[in-house]
């Protein structure tokens, strides 16, 4: 089956936003207008096509990023719908990694919100070109120009308006297209309502000229010929302007801003035109860098069908009909179903079974996938999120994705033996699907511990366990993921000796143990010269050290950011073994942690509270009582925005407290920011509770 669309005609893009900015509704409208969805799904009716998990339809939020293919003006659009809730930023990271462009949706009333900032930063990290769509222009309080100012003030973006709204709130009826200098007016709010091009209303003509001039000046800066002509009094024509806006988006020189109301069916078609006209194709994004599988030297892959095949797995889902499906982006070459490939990230062979094109949760079998395609593969055995699949004869490892550490945990106890078995299977599937969700067993209590990015994240996992996998279990209270850290350098010389006749045990190790840089993790280095500890015992040393990392000396929390050097040791020809060195290393490391002034670290959250002004005093007083540090305040519309850093331990149940003293009018978002040392008095309480 040959390629149906040239790679230049692909647009792989995502729709990113803060929760409730109308992202899923915008996607639904896109699917409707591109002819994919016959009946439009409304989020508040729980029928959105892209939100197909039960939990999403109930909560009205998007949890998993579904991938969908549709067509507009003969271009092939692969859309990744991403969640906007802060507990699911991992999904956004994963999607951005495989996108070529993005549409950032803002709520016309709220402007740039905390999660918008997070997503914008993630898009910066992966160099994703983007256009901005100011949605909900029909809402009370919608303010297009405030949103544009927010893009500059809150995310240091460079907005350039390509459209201006005609009317606002209930009188919003269309947009001014600053490239054509025409008004686009919709004749009603019905689905697929027709629109017409008209002359710009007289009362908006001056404003249109002012913003068109700003747009042209931003564009001609990118092209010497256009700049020269403009200085001579010749404005660029429509086609030149579109080319220059496209160039600006690809170079991230500025961010074009459009507006509309997806819910009221206004502004979606021009947004689709902008996706086609301005967002890059895979060919525009150019080569992708990777590492040679054998030599680990940098190599490149080009987005052509003739290059060696390579693809990146960016999402794994469990599908009730097909089993495990792995969403992949093909970066180079082509692959047929039935092909044998290698997972170069894990050095495992895989066979490509069924290949599916996904439309939310409908699927279509395809026999072949080409550079630029986003496909779902059924039946892969060993592939995880972030792994590379490629041609075994020319293997490459595409860049790894980095995933954040979980900050909150709960214990789960199955109610029966049957539940125990179901729980094991379910958790291994959930952990494979979501790298920010970790599962472990508490060595002391034998309980299963689930770790995640926030209360909602874990709530939804528990919900999936109960509903999808029918596991009946007791769920503990959420606990903070504390960490332990050494503060002083220690030199420890330790000998493990057990010689009581017969084969004994003997191992001596001498370590320098010192704090590592924050976030640098654990580092081990052997500085042994002259064979004081034979090479075959070094893995035993590492194993002993690793066994302590999982449970520190203060209260059994994981140890972070520590550097260990093995500088000397001794062995016995008969009595030494890897096990003896493992035992010696474990004891020496524990001694170093005890003597090295270990302290407790706790996750500190970045909290933003949006509250009517009359409750500001109560909000600040309450945050202070939670050991919060107020970082600043500003106004957003008629609400006060309070930013603070607060330890996670003091944020449990905050949502109910905030609702009660603000009569439900204040809301908040929080996300993990950093770990810091727990004050002495608090630390003593935590140690007494857990030790």
Swiss-Prot record:
Cellular localisation: Cytoplasm
One cellular-component annotation, GO: cytoplasm
Keywords associated with the record: Cytoplasm, Elongation factor, GTP-binding, Nucleotide-binding, Protein biosynthesis
GO MF entries: GTP binding; GTPase activity; translation elongation factor activity
Binding site for GTP: 17-24, 81-85, 135-138
PROSITE patterns recorded: G_TR_1, G_TR_2
Main location: cytoplasm
Protein name: Elongation factor G
Biological source species: Methylorubrum extorquens (strain PA1)
């Amino acid at each position: 089956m040959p390629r149906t669309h040239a790679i230049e005609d692909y647009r792989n893009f995502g729709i990113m936003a803060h929760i409730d900015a109308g992202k899923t509704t915008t996607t639904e409208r896109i699917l409707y207008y591109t002819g994919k969805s016959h009946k439009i799904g409304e989020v508040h009716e729980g029928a959105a096509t892209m939100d197909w998990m039960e939990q999403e339809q109930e909560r009205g939020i998007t949890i998993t990023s579904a991938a969908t293919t549709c067509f507009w003006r003969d271009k092939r659009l692969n859309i990744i719908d991403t969640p906007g809730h802060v507990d699911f930023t991992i999904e956004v990271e994963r999607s951005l990694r495989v996108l070529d462009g993005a549409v950032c949706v803002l709520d016309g009333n709220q402007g740039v919100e905390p999660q918008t900032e997070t997503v914008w930063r993630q898009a910066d990290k992966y160099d994703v070109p983007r256009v901005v769509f100011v949605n909900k222009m029909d809402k009370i309080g919608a303010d297009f120009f405030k949103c544009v100012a927010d893009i500059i003030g809150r995310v240091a973006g460079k907005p350039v308006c390509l459209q201006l709204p005609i009317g606002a709130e209930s009188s919003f009826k269309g947009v001014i297209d600053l490239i054509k200098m025409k008004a686009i007016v919709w004749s009603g709010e019905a689905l697929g309502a027709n629109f017409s091009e008209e002359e710009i209303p007289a009362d908006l003509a001056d404003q249109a000229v002012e913003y068109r001039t700003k747009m042209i000046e931003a564009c001609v800066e990118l092209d010497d010929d256009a700049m020269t002509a403009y200085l001579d009094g010749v404005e660029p024509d429509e086609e030149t302007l579109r080319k220059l806006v496209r160039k600006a988006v690809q170079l991230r020189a500025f961010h074009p801003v459009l507006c509309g109301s997806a819910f009221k069916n206004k502004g979606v078609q021009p947004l689709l035109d902008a996706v086609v006209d301005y967002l890059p194709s895979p060919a525009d994004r150019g080569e992708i860098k990777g590492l040679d599988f054998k030599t680990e030297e940098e190599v490149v892959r080009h987005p052509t069908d003739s290059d060696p095949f390579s693809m990146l797995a960016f999402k794994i889902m469990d599908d009730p009909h097909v089993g495990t499906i792995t969403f992949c982006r093909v970066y180079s070459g082509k692959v047929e179903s039935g092909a044998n490939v290698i997972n170069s990230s894990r050095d495992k062979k895989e066979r490509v079974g069924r290949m599916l094109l996904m439309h939310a949760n409908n699927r279509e079998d395809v026999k072949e996938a080409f550079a630029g395609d986003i496909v779902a593969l059924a039946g892969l055995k060993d592939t995880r999120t972030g792994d590379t699949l490629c041609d075994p004869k020319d293997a490459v490892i595409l860049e790894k994705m980095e995933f954040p550490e979980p900050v909150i945990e709960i214990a789960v106890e199955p109610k029966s033996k049957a539940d125990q078995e179901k729980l094991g299977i379910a958790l291994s599937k959930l952990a494979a699907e979501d790298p920010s969700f970790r599962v472990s067993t508490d060595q002391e209590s034998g309980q299963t511990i689930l770790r995640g990015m926030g209360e909602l994240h874990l709530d939804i996992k528990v919900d999936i366990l109960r509903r999808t996998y029918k596991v009946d279990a007791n769920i503990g209270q959420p606990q903070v993921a504390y960490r332990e850290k050494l503060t002083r350098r220690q030199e420890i010389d330790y000998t493990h000796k057990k010689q009581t006749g017969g084969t004994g045990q003997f191992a001596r190790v001498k370590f320098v143990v010192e704090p590592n840089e924050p976030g640098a993790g654990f580092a081990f280095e052997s500085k042994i010269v002259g064979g004081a500890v034979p090479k075959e015992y070094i893995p035993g040393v590492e194993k002993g050290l690793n066994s302590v990392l999982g449970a520190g000396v203060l209260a059994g929390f994981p140890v972070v950011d520590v550097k260990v050097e093995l500088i000397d040791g001794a062995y016995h020809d008969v009595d030494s073994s890897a096990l003896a060195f493992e035992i010696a290393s474990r004891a020496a490391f524990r001694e170093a942690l005890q003597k090295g002034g270990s302290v407790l670290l706790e996750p500190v959250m970045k909290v933003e509270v949006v509250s009517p002004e009359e409750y500001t005093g109560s909000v600040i007083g309450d945050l202070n009582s939670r050991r919060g540090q107020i970082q600043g305040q500003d106004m957003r519309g008629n609400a006060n925005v309070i930013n603070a850093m607060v330890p996670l331990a003091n944020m449990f149940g905050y949502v109910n407290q905030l609702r009660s003293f603000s009569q439900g009018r204040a809301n908040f978002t929080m996300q993990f920011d950093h770990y810091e040392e727990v004050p002495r008095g608090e630390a003593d309480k935590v140690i007494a509770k857990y030790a």
